[in-house]
Design a protein with these regions (language model features):
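Conserved beta-strand positions in the central sheet of alpha/beta enzyme cores
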Residues: 44, 102-103, 174, 266
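Active-site pocket-lining/capping segments in soluble small-molecule metabolic enzymes
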Residues: 23, 119-145, 195-247, 252, ...
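Active-site beta-loop-alpha junctions enriched in small/polar residues
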Residues: 16-19, 46-50, 75-81, 106-107, ...
Length: 285
């Protein structure tokens, strides 16, 4: 199967992040219980920088897979990892019946020297995908960038890298968040011409505060369309109206994708189940 669990006409999946502290697991489980009521195709779990919170990722992924009986996709970054580190995390995931990994390069740790960065065992995400494909039986996903990765020289270069990920063993992709669907539609067309044949889930992040948009754009490099900029300008001083308008924008964005034939949507929930519920009540399933 391409994506973990195809069961609805429109398959919606969620991203969550693990708790930062050991004492926060019960709250995290409650969030997951709420998200599970929406019958997602899968739930992905983010990974600490350099694997610093990989144990928490494994525990959350285990709860999703074993307690909730929903396919868990564990994020795995490799920029600061050795091959033995990767295999150890794979072993821990397998012991918890987790069979899906989203393979990412990850951000360079602040304490990583130039020498360490230059000599790292995994230079790019496709190296991790290839290693996992050759040494494990996980279903492997990769990331893609409708507006290109900020480090890429051009979209052509970025698409070449995406093809390398597919050739290395990625069976589906999850896109970086975007706010303008035209970028995604054009990206799909270009990816198809490049020979990308595996599914590409559309990554969608609801914007519910003016502060959030600045952080999100700086981290993702995503463009802000006029319609969203107008919402921020109109409601930045009114948090509740900003939240409502941001969720409405997200719903309209997803509905447009669905009406244009996009069946796989991945929602970056930011661990906010109430927000996710409002979105799920207003999109196609």
């Amino acid at each position: 199967m391409a994506t973990p669990n195809k069961k609805n006409k429109y398959d919606i999946s969620f991203e969550v992040f693990p708790p930062k502290k050991d004492g926060e697991f019960e709250a995290a489980f409650e969030i997951l219980n709420a998200l599970a009521t929406h019958d997602p195709a899968f739930i992905s779990v983010t990974y600490g920088a350099g694997g610093s919170r990989s144990g928490k990722t494994v525990e959350i992924a285990s709860y999703i897979q074993n307690k909730l009986q929903i396919d868990a996709v564990a994020h795995m970054t490799c920029v600061g990892s050795k091959k033995d580190d990767i295999l150890a995390v794979c072993k821990a995931l397998k012991e918890q019946n987790v069979c899906h990994i989203l393979a990412l390069r990850g951000d360079r740790p602040k304490d990583m020297s130039d020498e360490q960065f230059a000599s790292r065992e995994f230079a790019h995400a496709n190296d991790l995908i290839d290693f996992l494909h050759q040494n494990t039986d996980f279903t492997i996903a990769g990331a893609c960038y409708p507006e290109k990765h900020f480090e890429s020289f051009s979209m052509e270069s970025d698409l070449n890298n995406l093809k390398k990920k597919q050739d290395a063993g990625a069976s589906f992709f999850i896109s970086q968040l975007f706010f303008d669907n035209d970028f995604y539609y054009h990206f799909l067309e270009k990816a198809g011409k490049k020979g990308i044949t595996v599914p590409i889930c559309a990554g969608i992040m609801p914007i519910t505060s003016a502060k959030q948009i600045g952080t999100t754009v700086s981290l993702s490099g995503s463009s802000v369309p006029k319609a969203l900029a107008d919402i921020i300008a109109a409601y930045s001083d009114n948090p509740e109206d900003m939240r409502k308008a941001g969720i409405d924008f997200c719903i309209r964005q997803i509905r447009d994708l669905q009406e244009n034939g996009i069946k796989d949507i991945h929602i970056y929930t930011m661990n906010k189940p109430k927000m996710a519920a409002e979105i799920m009540a207003n999109i196609l399933r």
